[in-house]
């Protein structure tokens, strides 16, 4: 069936002492939320509607031209995102972790970001502009599927003998995807229509677990999808006016 969402939001924008602030509080009333779960031990997945769910939270953004050459910004959000209904199977058991009060999948409760740009008062190498950028992002813990927050969800037994394995081996994993921090740095110079940028993304080589993938309900492949490792590179751009 069709999913519907009714959004209620109130926001405030203010400017004081050089700061610009945007703050918003919201409540989303979700009807017939579409949820997808693994279909037992086969490779298929099932989708169904959950009668009631909600997300509510607070978002903010603060920016300031701190000096003539330095710009800073801060942003963040706190979100409660939960089921307000319980779905059960024919035996009366809760289906795939879809229970009143359980968290919705893939939604972190907290996210924060800081970014800054510094433009040199006297650009280097006779360039038109020389600048430094830094950005930091924090993402809170999450679940890939609603069922991942059920007790015992991280216990997998394949039941299949293969390559010397009996199939009775137990693999134990924590399916609560942990929070992570990413720091990116870059420096650039501009010569007329040309721009050169040296960047280091994921400076501390954070191994962020973005989601968990299980094949055949965990009887086959078990793997985490991760972020890009530390990456160093150079970008050249030409701006057409």
Outline where the language-model segments fall:
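Transmembrane beta-barrel outer-membrane domains
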Residues: 1-5, 16, 41, 51-55, ...
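Hydrophobic, lipid-facing positions within transmembrane beta-strands of outer-membrane proteins
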Residues: 6-10, 21, 56-60, 110-114, ...
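Membrane-embedded beta-barrel scaffold of Gram-negative outer-membrane proteins
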Residues: 1-58, 77, 81-84
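Residue-level signature of outer-membrane beta-barrel architecture
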Residues: 2, 12-14, 64-65, 118-120, ...
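Solvent-exposed loop segments that connect transmembrane elements
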Residues: 35-49, 83-102, 143-173, 210-224
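Gram-negative outer-membrane beta-barrel transporters
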Residues: 27-29, 48-146, 235-239
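C-terminal beta-signal and adjacent terminal beta-strands/loops
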Residues: 31, 125, 137-157, 188-241
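Repeated loop/turn-to-beta-strand initiation elements of outer-membrane beta-barrel proteins
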Residues: 18-21, 69-72, 123-125, 193-198
């Amino acid at each position: 069936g069709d999913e519907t969402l009714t959004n209620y939001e109130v926001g405030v924008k203010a400017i004081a002492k050089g700061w610009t602030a945007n703050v918003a509080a919201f409540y989303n009333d979700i009807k017939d939320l579409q949820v997808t779960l693994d279909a037992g031990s086969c490779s298929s997945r099932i989708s169904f509607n959950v009668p009631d769910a909600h997300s509510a939270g607070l978002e903010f953004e603060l920016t300031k031209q701190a000096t003539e050459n330095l710009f800073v910004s801060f942003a963040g959000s706190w979100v409660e995102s939960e089921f307000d209904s319980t779905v059960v199977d024919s035996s009366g058991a809760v289906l795939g972790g879809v229970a009143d009060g359980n968290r919705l999948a893939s939604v972190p409760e907290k996210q924060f970001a800081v970014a800054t740009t510094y433009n040199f008062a006297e650009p280097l190498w006779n360039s038109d502009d020389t600048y430094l950028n830094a950005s930091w992002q924090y993402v809170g813990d999450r679940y890939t599927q609603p069922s991942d927050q059920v007790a015992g969800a991280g216990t997998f037994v394949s039941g299949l003998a293969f390559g010397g394995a009996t199939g009775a081996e137990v693999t134990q994993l924590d399916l609560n995807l942990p929070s992570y921090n990413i720091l990116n740095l870059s420096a650039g110079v501009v010569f007329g229509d040309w721009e050169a940028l040296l960047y280091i993304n994921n400076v501390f080589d954070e191994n962020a677990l973005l989601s968990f993938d299980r094949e055949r309900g965990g009887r086959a492949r078990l793997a985490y999808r991760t972020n890009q490792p530390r990456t160093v590179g150079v970008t050249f751009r030409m701006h057409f006016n």
